[in-house]
Curated annotation (Swiss-Prot):
Record's catalysed reaction(s): Hydrolysis of proteins to small peptides in the presence of ATP and magnesium. alpha-casein is the usual test substrate. In the absence of ATP, only oligopeptides shorter than five residues are hydrolyzed (such as succinyl-Leu-Tyr-|-NHMec, and Leu-Tyr-Leu-|-Tyr-Trp, in which cleavage of the -Tyr-|-Leu- and -Tyr-|-Trp bonds also occurs)
One Gene Ontology MF term: ATPase binding
Active site (UniProt): S98, H123
Compartments where located: Cytoplasm
Pfam families in the record: CLP_protease
Keyword annotations of the record: Cytoplasm, Hydrolase, Protease, Serine protease
HAMAP family, sorted: ClpP
Coiled coil: none
Main location (coarse class): cytoplasm
The species this protein was found in: Listeria monocytogenes serovar 1/2a (strain ATCC BAA-679 / EGD-e)
Protein name: ATP-dependent Clp protease proteolytic subunit
Length: 198
């Protein structure tokens, strides 16, 4: 059961009811609080594009509590974060794992944060293949290309050498917020909104 709270605002023209996500969007806040699939990605991408069209000079705040999910859906979000003119500040909370950690690290330079008790997990892309040997070989080559591309991006965003990223993502690698900061996945640990930029 998915209950979405409603917020009532009083204005000079009367009352207005918003679902909580629409109200947060007014403050340029986007929540990624689930596994990443095409539907979630389409929603996040739409919100990024809307906020950028509204004011490309004001930062967007993407809060992430996600176990990860689809690589192609996550890459759609990643590409849109880079496509929009507005800086996207990322804030990790709870667990940012797999594609969730990738998106956390993809925030604007100097504007990637985690709350003190957030956990961040990086690993290599997961994929499954079945069918004839040739089909399995094609799928394996494809996942290796994706792994190389994602490791290259992570190396650029963290400042870690590619070889270190490749080694450290070989298996599930869990980090505290402080370890993620030391590694370069985030820029700072914040305890309240005053730690955000802008």
């Amino acid at each position: 059961m998915n209950l979405i709270p409603t917020v009532i605002e009083q204005t000079s023209r009367g009352e207005r009811a918003y679902d909580i996500y629409s109200r947060l969007l007014k403050d340029r806040i986007i929540m990624l609080g689930s596994a990443i699939d095409d539907n979630v990605a389409n929603s996040i991408v739409s919100q990024l594009l809307f906020l950028d069209a509204q004011d490309p000079e004001k930062d967007i705040f993407l809060y992430i509590n996600s176990p990860g999910g689809s690589i192609s859906a996550g890459m759609a979000i990643y590409d849109t974060m880079n496509f929009v003119k507005a800086d996207v500040q990322t804030i990790g909370m709870g667990m940012a794992a797999s594609m969730g950690s990738f998106l956390l690290t993809a925030g604007a330079n100097g504007k990637r944060f985690a709350l003190p008790n957030a956990e961040i997990m990086i690993h290599q892309p997961l994929g499954g293949a079945q069918g004839q040997a040739t089909e399995i070989e094609i799928a394996a080559r494809h996942i290796l290309k994706i792994k190389e591309r994602m490791n290259t991006i992570m190396a650029e965003k963290t400042g870690q050498p590619y070889e270190v990223i490749a080694r450290d993502t070989d298996r599930d690698n869990f980090m505290t917020a402080q370890e993620a900061k030391d590694y370069g996945l985030i820029d700072d640990i914040i305890i309240n909104k005053s730690g955000l930029k802008g």
